[in-house]
A protein has these predicted regions:
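Rossmann-fold cofactor-recognition segment
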Residues: 1-9
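Conserved mid-core segment of classical short-chain dehydrogenase/reductases
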Residues: 12, 33-50, 90
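Active-site helix of classical SDR
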Residues: 64, 97
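Active-site-adjacent segment of SDR/Rossmann-fold oxidoreductases
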Residues: 71, 86, 107-118
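Residue(s) in the substrate-gating loop at a strand-loop-helix junction
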Residues: 81
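Active-site loop immediately N-terminal to the catalytic Tyr-X3-Lys motif
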Residues: 88-92, 135
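C-terminal helical subdomain
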Residues: 121-122, 129, 133-175
């Protein structure tokens, strides 16, 4: 089933289709996301920010709300980012959406405890993908290395899955956060 997650009726249609055709689905992975490198003075900043917020925040919140009602659901995995902890100013809105999703994930974990739905946060660092634009992340770790590490952490029962620089950011104290921020945002 193909769905544009930025369109609310399509999200509802996706949920209805899955509940009718795959009612035994037990895991929701909220991994949709867009990242725009932009400056607040760009003429299209607001529209791009709105698109990022819709796709990176409203869509996964809506999907979690819908799928939490699926009787077979046992796990929700929300994908955030190492930028949830320390923002990169060139992708300020993206960083903020991932910080929102981190906070939401922590609360959702608590809220869904009574329904026996486990909520896991997957926290990737920059990986060698085209997120944000072609070639921007060349030289970063391979997705396959990240996935291998994530599966090991899932086997260990972890609920916050980190890798590489995202692990350091997730565990950083205030001084380290300030140092990271200053290095990332000269």
């Amino acid at each position: 089933k193909v769905c544009d997650l930025s369109i609310e009726p399509e999200r509802i249609e996706l949920y209805n289709w899955i509940s009718e055709n795959h009612s035994n689905l037990n895991i929701l992975v909220n991994n949709a996301g867009i990242q725009n490198w932009m400056n607040v003075s760009d003429s299209d900043f607001y529209q791009k920010a709105n698109d990022e917020i819709t796709t990176n925040v409203l869509a996964p919140v809506h999907l979690a709300t819908l799928f939490a009602n699926l009787k077979s659901l046992t796990t929700i995995i929300n994908v955030t980012s190492g930028l949830a902890f320390i923002p990169f100013s060139k992708v300020a809105v993206y960083s903020a959406t991932k910080a929102f999703m981190r906070s939401f994930t922590l609360s959702l974990r608590h809220l869904l405890k009574s329904k026996n739905i486990e909520v896991i946060e997957m926290i990737p660092p920059a990986l060698n993908t085209d997120l944000g634009g072609k070639g921007i992340h060349d030289g970063h770790p391979a997705v396959s290395d990240f996935v291998e590490s994530i599966f090991e952490q899932l086997k260990e029962g972890k609920t916050e899955l980190t890798f590489g620089t995202s692990e350091a950011r997730a565990n950083a104290n205030n001084e380290a956060i300030a140092d990271y921020f200053n290095k990332m945002n000269p």
